[in-house]
UniProtKB/Swiss-Prot annotation:
This is Citrate-proton symporter. One of its GO terms (biological process) is citrate metabolic process. The gene is citH. PANTHER family: ALPHA-KETOGLUTARATE PERMEASE, CITRATE-PROTON SYMPORTER. The lineage of its organism: Bacteria, Pseudomonadati, Pseudomonadota, Gammaproteobacteria, Enterobacterales. It comes from Klebsiella pneumoniae. Keywords: Cell inner membrane, Cell membrane, Citrate utilization, Membrane, Symport, Transmembrane, Transmembrane helix, Transport. Residues 63-72, 136-137, 199, 273-289, 340, 401-411 are periplasmic. One of its GO terms (molecular function) is symporter activity.
Amino acid sequence: MPTARCSMRASSTAPVRMMATAGGARIGAILRVTSGNFLEQFDFFLFGFYATYIAHTFFPASSEFASLMMTFAVFGAGFLMRPIGAIVLGAYIDKVGRRKGLIVTLSIMATGTFLIVLIPSYQTIGLWAPLLVLIGRLLQGFSAGAELGGVSVYLAEIATPGRKGFYTSWQSGSQQVAIMVAAAMGFALNAVLEPSAISDWGWRIPFLFGVLIVPFIFILRRKLEETQEFTARRHHLAMRQVFATLLANWQVVIAGMMMVAMTTTAFYLITVYAPTFGKKVLMLSASDSLLVTLLVAISNFFWLPVGGALSDRFGRRSVLIAMTLLALATAWPALTMLANAPSFLMMLSVLLWLSFIYGMYNGAMIPALTEIMPAEVRVAGFSLAYSLATAVFGGFTPVISTALIEYTGDKASPGYWMSFAAICGLLATCYLYRRSAVALQTAR
């Protein structure tokens, strides 16, 4: 009898151990696959926050406005490479697998990070300085074009049934962790270094940290396992067939791009551009602007999985439409309140509200985008739609916001840009879910 009881006890605990092991394996996979996403966003946020110092170092001009515009133009140029990277690297990932492809994107991304740390100033090497910065941004844009799509699809393919929204939200969640780390480092530098030291060389320290963690991220990525869904698929399209399938489904790609427009505009407005907006437009201290950005990233980190989980429960369409309508109704009025009464608390309140809208919308949008693409070109299709939106909307949000304020005199005018992106997202959502019964086409 004791033996029988022990046997029954062992058999009853075996499923629990298996579930715990499977859960631990999925958590490990999430950490490994999102590590590269962390590096990408860490670097992009730093470039946005230290834009004034980068402008001074690499893009000297007759006026601060012109210098800053050139810096943000180079920042945006990297996004123009994203659609090319999405097609080329996205097709490669769809052909050879998620694991191999994501190691390649990380390698290219790391090269761009190394460049920004090592390039001497304009006064030292002249025109080579801005040219090399541009090359670094183009390389990072090329790799980022497929990095985000590859990570999102990987998470969608390892998700447990009915929890795809929750799982894919951690792609964007890793970006928020990157912003938290970058903002915390910037806050610490402001506390220990004089402004002149930060302007001369101190701004490079966070970028150096990014370089130092690259080997550890490579180790994590190499331990990734291929998804069962990709392995089980018997037919993998050749590169030419991937391009043909994307062309056959161009309407889905364009509608997907418009759906992403809302999320990428909101994200770059409240994170990448916000520190510069706080310092240069609202005249808040650099430390206050950084602290607001840090708290906004924490807010994003909370709302992203909530949005994903709610979309699992109530459907993607409901969450997407609700958030686009909220953005359309409140983006400009909220920024007008901030412009009329600029303070740390007001900036924090307004950006936390926009963070709620962004987090809820993006939590539903990422799984929706993985679901509307044909399985054979899921990474390439997702990446192309996302990259086009980032190139047209998100990447140029800082420069468009700067130009709108300069030429209209309205400090709240970035709200017009976000409202326009919300209209795009609303129309795309209605279109995609109205045509959900239409068969997607695969080129054979």
